[in-house]
Amino acid sequence: MATVPVYCVCRLPYDVTRFMIECDACKDWFHGSCVGVEEEEAPDIDIYHCPNCEKTHGKSTLKKKRTWHKHGPGPTPDVKPVQNGSQLFIKELRSRTFPSAEDVVSRVPGSQLTVGYMEEHGFTEPILVPKKDGLGLAVPAPTFYVSDVENYVGPERSVDVTDVTKQKDCKMKLKEFVDYYYSTNRKRVLNVTNLEFSDTRMSSFVEPPDIVKKLSWVENYWPDDALLAKPKVTKYCLICVKDSYTDFHIDSGGASAWYHVLKGEKIFYLIRPASANISLYERWRSASNHSEMFFADQVDRCYKCTVKQGQTLFIPSGWIYATLTPVDCLAFAGHFLHSLSVEMQMRAYEVERRLKLGSLTQFPNFETACWYMGKHLLEAFKGSHKSGKQLPPHLVQGAKILNGAFRSWTKKQALAEHEDELPEHFRPSQLIKDLAKEIRLSENASKTVRPEVNAAASSDEVCDGDREKEEPPSPVETTPPRSLLEKVSKKKTSKTVKMPKPSKIPKPPKSPKPPKTLKLKDGSKKKGKKCKESASPTIPNLDLLEAHTKEALTKMEPPKKGKTPKSVLSVPNKDTVHTQNDMERLEIREQTKSKSEAKWKYKNSKPDSLLKMEEEQRLEKSPLAGNKDKFSFSFSNRKLLGSKALRPPSSPGVFGALQSFKEDKAKPVRDEYEYVSDDGELKIDEFPIRRKKSAPKRDLSFLLDKKEALLMPTSKPKLDSAVYKSDDSSDEGSLHIDTDTKPGRNAKVKKESGSSAAGILDLLQASEEVGALEYNPNSQPPASPSTQEAIQGMLSMANLQASDSCLQTTWGTGQAKGGSLAAHGARKIGGGNKGTGKRLLKRTAKNSVDLEDYEEQDHLDACFKDSDYVYPSLESDEDNPVFKSRSKKRKGSDDAPYSPTARVGPSVPRQDRPVREGTRVASIETGLAAAAAKLSQQEEQKNRKKKNTKRKPAPNTASPSISTSASASTGTTSASTTPASTTPASTTPASTTPASTSTASSQASQEGSSPEPPPESHSSSLADHEYTAAGTFSGSQAGRASQPMAPGVFLTQRRPSASSPNNTAAKGKRTKKGMATAKQRLGKILKIHRNGKLLL
């Protein structure tokens, strides 16, 4: 039995759990604990000698380090870097002076630190509590020390220890660290900062402050029965020896932290979480040599805060800080997430993800805590709406930040990284939609309450408008300018449009006096940033009042949606406003529903000045959303009515409906948190933010349709031309299709074009569903030929060839006024049909005649040209192809390219059928027949010279077509029955030249389109093919017989003719049923033309 080897002075076998070192002299192994060598010291030893070898070989030698300036205690030149945490670094840090933290740290007694205090003053700066009285903090007695920690936590507990000098982490057992702590000879500086003891017996001795319990997301909103356990980040024990240093960092997840010093003292170096500082921190932390750079030297100010025994320090989210322990210290700490600074928490979390930091104090499942908080916020919003109360602004803002983070986490490309932290039984898309809806409702309710408070204060200042113009309000007073601007907007709207107020608004205000409004307009100056597309140059813009109001409202929260139409148009009476606000709260959901239904029509029909103004509002998020829209709307209407010389209608209902429609649609200025939704259903927003790409004008037919219902214009062609000029742009960013929400426009097209009602809506919808691309004289030219070919290809696949015709006809009639379209169509026909017959030319001439008649009718009618206009006439007799005979349909279905000048109607009867495998192409068969006939004739002539036997008469002069067809059928039979003859290698030389194949294809296409062609016509076509193939065949048999055959063609198939009597053996081998005679074989070939459609 083999003995187990033993090692070391203790003579014990090898133990994998114990550190061992080899002696370089005797080559024996020794336990580190037996010879007094620590595992962390072993890398610094160059040559090790055991205690026995030290007597003969001397002591162990250490490695010669070239970077002792980083860690050594001696003085070094200034040009060399110093390692953070080294003895030299600590000495330099102690000697430095920093700004006092009294400027940024608030001293608050524990009894005053409540949730109300936090919400009122915010939690953006550190808070120092001198004593723990009233704080609700529970900690052990001051006699509690490190040995007690080992007793209550357990000596075998593995802890993460930081080597301060090297700024590296390692693991030790707690008992080993305690032994190091109490040792008198500390060779290294070790630091324990993340001993989380919430699941140990020591947890009963420590309780976080009450304010932490009330604010913490994990403590309040994380379910106890959740599948993922709560993160254990609330109770940490810090055991730090003298000169322990923790470099600058941001707590994981942007969490806030609390520190209580039980024994000793700690120094905090604090840096504000400004944007510049966070960017500098991210750059510094990502550098490879960041441990040799002191981060405080890169920022403008770093504050020094000393926390002594018995004091508690609260550090807000995002603060960058480092800690130094001047004396041995025992402290307790904890981290928590809260709703007072959600944005900073998210930013710090994103920085942490980008840097991929592996902090010792990680905040596990940070995203899960955010999901639970989002669910809680949704319930809080619903409860506040039921009770009629409003949530605090920081909660609304936090909900926005969280909802934006939820959307980014649930995107398709990012879901794989974040789905692990998604709570079980959660529906993230539904939560995002509901939360966005509640945020929007809460914002709308808060905006309707604001005018109530400010209405009385603003009524006095509205009376004297001239004084306001001379002495504009101070930027500090934000409320009066808002109210004043609302009333001035009312004045300008009513004065410019000259229409009564909508009847549905209760208690409409008295129209203002004209002199004041005129003064305001005449004295206006172009100051501040204005919209270029809002009005024409002849119409004045906003005056100094707008500039001062913009400046005054910059400090206010920019409203995402200017949703105060009723309070804007009502008198500043508190009771009236209160009643209206109550009505608004009840009608919020109905308004959102009506808005989602009317969004499509309004987006496609409102004036361009409104579209441009809304684009600037979305991009710049200006606080004057509603008022800008109101001014732009009035100016645009004034310009529109003046340019067309139309008298405004006297009925108040038109402008009332129009104005309410305008307000309902202009109020929502969408942001990333908004959804257009009903009470329970999600409405997809088809209108993303428009980009400024196209021409500034747009379709104004929405306004014209409403006016046409009440008055008839004096000159209808003038009105149509004006509308035609205004409709000269299409949004390049997105293509909008609207067929069923514009009955008025469709009716107008029907009335003016004079076509039948049957089928016009189908053609309108077909043309718009395909693309509805409109090209007018003032707009851009049509797409390139390659783009048009691609469009036509897609249309042909969908059997919708009408749209291309509309597209070409529209551009042609607009540009050439009748002449260029015919040339364009002729050019297209000429390019595509070079090899067609006379029948196609006759049809083309007929189409061009019809086109000229149609263009003449088009110019006489001066039709309304927009996306709904259908240029082709609808009186064609091909509207009902079902009742046409089969022969008539076959007659007009030549295999010709699509002509853009043809009349638009339903598709021709025969449609493209899918390619079937195993079918033979007729053109190849024809070429094979011609080649086989030629081969047969050559062999017959050879046999005629050799033997004087009896044979069939040759069709030299008398009947060339009949004999050629017979010989062609004979050759085709021999070629087609051989498998090799159907391959491309054999068929291509058989046709002799490409011209022969193309000619055969064109001839076959003409003959194949007739319904029941007789055999004579086909035999003659085969003969014609041979005589006209490539110009190499003569008109006689002798000329063809002298032609040599192409190399490699039919070499394996050269056999005598099937009609020869000397070929009986071969004839018996190849005979099949129905293929015995030449007539039967010819009939088989002709069945291809009889039943199939020839596709080239």
UniProtKB/Swiss-Prot annotation:
The modification Phosphoserine is found at residues 474, 536, 651, 677, 701, 726, 729-730, 734, 873, 876, 893, 1057. Residues 1031-1040, 1054-1065 have a biased composition (Polar residues). Keywords: Acetylation, Activator, Centromere, Chromatin regulator, Chromosome, Dioxygenase, Iron, Isopeptide bond, Kinetochore, Metal-binding, Nucleus, Oxidoreductase, Phosphoprotein, Transcription, Transcription regulation, Ubl conjugation, Zinc, Zinc-finger. Residues 197-353 form the JmjC domain. Fe cation binds at residues 249, 251, 321. Residues 503-515 have a biased composition (Pro residues). Residues 943-953 have a biased composition (Basic residues). This is Lysine-specific demethylase PHF2. It comes from Mus musculus (Mouse).
